[in-house]
Amino acid sequence: CALPIFNNIIPMPKDLLIEASTSGEFGMQYIIAQQRKPFNSQDDLKVIQWMEIQEEKVREEALQLGMTYLRNWGKYGYPTWYEWSIANWGTKWNAFNQNFEEPNVLWFDTAWEGVPLLIQTLSEIFPDVEFQYAYADEDLGSNVGKGTIRNGETDMTFPDNGSNEA
């Protein structure tokens, strides 16, 4: 059962739950490039060229998605769920493979790495609870950390990759 754990701590705006795609990114960049004419950069010209060789349906979809990305960027600072979740949760997806093996202990997986800032936010929501937090990458010996967090105050250690502590 996948519970939206991270979304309950730091809720993602629903408007951001849209497709994150290269064509949407190109649509957004194309709209921006059109506003800069005639002072386009080389990157602008590549995007313009890409848009001009697309079939009309693909071009229209890219432009529509690009407009939505720009609206979201202006409103939330991020075009889609992808950029927002990395910035706010520290990873691209919500927690998965959640497991409550014992009282007050939660195990979960993330897409990339630990989420100490998310746990810090949780500790600010519950200031009287001390969180003991540890994480490890599936690549043993790298990207590990552990410590305690209470009322937003963190005491974490991050061993060097490849060290005996890792």
Predicted ranges, named:
Residues 1-3:
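Short, small-residue-biased leader/transition segments that mark boundaries at the very start
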